[in-house]
From Swiss-Prot:
Pfam families: SKI. GO terms for biological process: amino acid biosynthetic process; aromatic amino acid family biosynthetic process; chorismate biosynthetic process. This is Shikimate kinase 1. GO terms for molecular function: ATP binding; magnesium ion binding; shikimate kinase activity. Its cofactor is Mg(2+). InterPro entries: P-loop_NTPase, Shikimate/glucono_kinase, Shikimate_kinase/TSH1, Shikimate_kinase_CS. HAMAP family: Shikimate_kinase. It comes from the Bacteria. Binds 1 Mg(2+) ion per subunit. Pathway: Metabolic intermediate biosynthesis; chorismate biosynthesis; chorismate from D-erythrose 4-phosphate and phosphoenolpyruvate: step 5/7. Mg(2+) binds at S18.
Length: 173
């Protein structure tokens, strides 16, 4: 990859966007950003608290602003929040400003990877986690697919293996 194109990782919670994003950025010698971490940095509070205080709409407004700013940078890897694709503006920006990689995973893997994580506001509800994840998948998977330039399943692969697959796919395009 001669020129450093922005790489934007989208996908559901537990797909490995942050872990794979860090690995990918390291291998490509690019800057890594995580939209949730940027929101936390700017607000001084964790995303769960922001979500509780401002509701999902307030959180999504912050997320949209952060992603807009970050996608204006050059040569970055950005791990987006799982729900960021709900915003048409965000989808358009991601598509226009870089390569969008959809990290796909099964509900079973999502459950295994998120079961002890208390920083997932959408899972801190009364409904069974499987039902929540299935509903989110039904709503969001078509949006991930709509903007994806590349789709990679992450289920039983290490971050390094997935990062190498992404690099290979980008080099062959």
């Amino acid at each position: 990859m001669a020129e450093k194109r922005n790489i934007f990782l989208v996908g559901p919670m537990g797909a490995g966007k942050s872990t794979i994003g860090r690995q990918l950025a390291q291998q490509l010698n690019m800057e890594f950003y995580d939209s949730d971490q940027e929101i936390e940095k700017r607000t001084g509070a964790d995303v769960g608290w922001v979500f509780d205080l401002e509701g999902e709409d307030g959180f999504r407004d912050r997320e949209e602003k952060v992603i807009n700013e970050l996608t204006e940078k050059q040569g970055i890897v950005l791990a987006t929040g799982g729900g960021s694709v709900k915003s048409r503006e965000t989808r358009n920006r991601l598509s226009a400003r870089g390569v969008v990689v959809y990290l796909e995973t099964t509900i079973e893997k999502q459950l295994a990877r998120t079961q002890r994580d208390k920083k997932r506001p959408l899972l801190q509800v009364e409904a069974p986690p499987r039902e929540v994840l299935e509903a989110l998948a039904n709503e969001r998977n078509p949006l991930y697919e709509e903007i994806a330039d590349v789709t990679i399943r992450t289920d039983d692969q290490s971050a390094k293996v997935v990062a190498n697959q992404i690099i290979h796919m980008l080099e062959s395009n």
